[in-house]
């Protein structure tokens, strides 16, 4: 039986192993028929030790001494089921204690009380700090490779989705007060600095008339002044890494939302928003991102690459919400063999992404970024004849100019008496075009998008990635559970592993001396 104690009594020590001998009240022996065939629980009951062998986790227990841990195949099974159902650690531990299907999946007896929920936190910490934090995802991916289900399937669809942060977004005042308090708490002597804007030992926010803009500006100015005083008082090379990070975060929040005021030494809220603005001192890695002018989220972004015929996720990554889709998408297929057909929407349509795919000998089936016109309904750059090899640009009227070394084609005074001027430019100085460094690639992409082959392939194969993302965020997974990129990357990889395993089971996964698909 598993112990029910806390993590420190269960998880420390040497690696535990599942007992190969069945106990008197073995759940699988007594209740296996209650677990539906074809379910993830039934599959794990039969094959969890082949999927998650002890050797997969042996490096997490280098000492080989002490009390045995919870068996690794049991922990991995619980983590997969937890990710599949979107349960908290507490609810997952409760499910292991009172659900027959979970006991069957983990090979426990009916009277086994399971383990304390903090054991899951401990194991995630060990995984995260190990050399292979995503080994459960890798184990499922190894099964994918062993079955050969992806053999000959040379398409990958890329997409991303925004995930809500696990903490509340903070305003400027809250961030400043929180960051100052953190520094005062973490660094000995910091509380002695003469700060005047607020009583930082008090719990509530500063007491002012919050509907008075002048009072709010004065408070912000005073808080920024306190932050600068505190930073200057702590310029010491003897700070620990954690203390340096706290001071660095204080410096960041003290500068990201403000600009110098009219009077010397004063500060005011800036009208612009910092492009990489920290939205919370509780989770400094989360970011703000607009999906459209009216739709936005604070948190992170999940990126996936999907094989569109099977729906299997071949790679995943997590970034702050404001990270660009293109570079993340290219990284997802970096380890793939050349010759893929890569499908994606226009968020991946930059010249840099197309150049990277061309360099790695992949074929892009990516929607082009829409062109903008200087005049509504007027000429776009595609109406100009651009010859990059000759270094010339010819306008719709037939006027040709040289392209400058910086990629500019300036028609200037040649537009003065042009009968097509109203369809081309409103500028008094005439039309000027700035060519993208990858102009030829972008032009080819726009032409490709008009072909029947592009449209057929895109419509047929790309929708699966959107379905995969719908599976990914179901059961409450639109909101991340943890703080920081590393923790949530591990959570994302666990969720993807669970989804991939369920998909493989639906495709007929079995183990008969090796992993095979029976369909």
What is each residue range found by the language model?
Residues 1-26, 511-519:
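Intrinsically disordered, low-complexity and often Lys/Arg-enriched segments
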Residues 60-74, 85-136:
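Trp/Phe/Arg-rich N-terminal binding region typifying the photolyase-homology
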